[in-house]
Amino acid sequence: MDRIENAQMNSLGTRKLYYENVHQTDFTAVVMECVPDKEEGYYRIVLDASAFFPEEGGQSADKGTLNGQEVLDVSIKQGILYHKTACEFPVGTRITGHVDWNRRFDFMQQHSGEHMISGLLHSHFGLENVGFHLSDREVTLDMNGEVSLEQLRLIEQEANAYVWKNLPVNISWPTAEELASLNYRSKLALTENVRIVEIPGVDLCACCAPHVDTTGQIGLIKVVNVQSHRGGVRINILCGNRALADYTEKQDSVWAISSLLSAKQPEVAGAVARAKEDARLQKERANALQAELLKVQMNALPSPEKVRHVLLFVGELDAIALRNAVNTLTGKYSGYCGIFAGDDTNGYRFIVGSASCNCQELADRMRRELSAKGGGSAPMIQGNVAVTADTLQTMWASL
């Protein structure tokens, strides 16, 4: 491992440019260490200074490049930043770094929005944030108590009202004495080098991550999901451009549904409910007709004196009706009684029963010869198979 000894870096860690200027995306720095990871085939680069925020505080690391080479990850240990790259950089050389600003700003919007929601839940309901995760795909915050959807909607409305006020987001590094006098949110008991993020009247929290300059830069805060989680709730939020993209996607869906169902946009939920109920009734009627057709087919079967095994094909029919029909047949015929629901194109659901034959033996054969899926017991088996009706009739003829 190559290394340049640097007393200041060893005592204070890498100079963190994102704390000096959160908007800085381009920088130059000297390579202090180049640590090969032989197992992974990567290198971990230590610089004297870096604008890359690492994976820390529940947030994924910044993305970007060093000398045009992709930075795959950034981690921090004892204040030193390690940049994971596929390329080796000689120790002592000066290199150029670039941070993906669009992604940085996106994460700033999400994290500042999370502070506002968590801070308001804390001040209104005494809830503590006990978990936080921010990645490219989601923002989740875990609270240690229950909150109703109605309460959450009020919190969301209040948070956005503070966004519109364009409040400053203040960053400070209070002394130990100053820290002792502050009533701030924190998951850990901290005593020194504590970075405080303040949104006046909304939140006061210890945090290591980059934040927006003012609440107006967040743009929009939207709660998109809430569910019970470990005695509390897990809340999913989207802020800024993510919230806009989510709204656009959902608006496109509403437009499409509105057109398909010939309903006004505010009325699509009711239109979908009616369409669902209509489909249920249609399915019930279709099942009733299929059940009647099945009875006709069963009555048309040869007598038990002429055949031992019987096989029937029907359209879509619910499992209860299929099972009842098979039970009726097994009370009449001594061999395998099979009913297959479906068609040659989409495959068949089946139930096979017998009062005297071992249906598990038939299931084994169907798996071997027809790649059928399913199982059951000696009196009855059920499953799925993707073959033609002719193939099944050939098998039944061989029983």
Q: Can you annotate each of these PLM segments?
A:
Residues 1-399:
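A glycine- and charged-residue-rich anion-binding loop/surface
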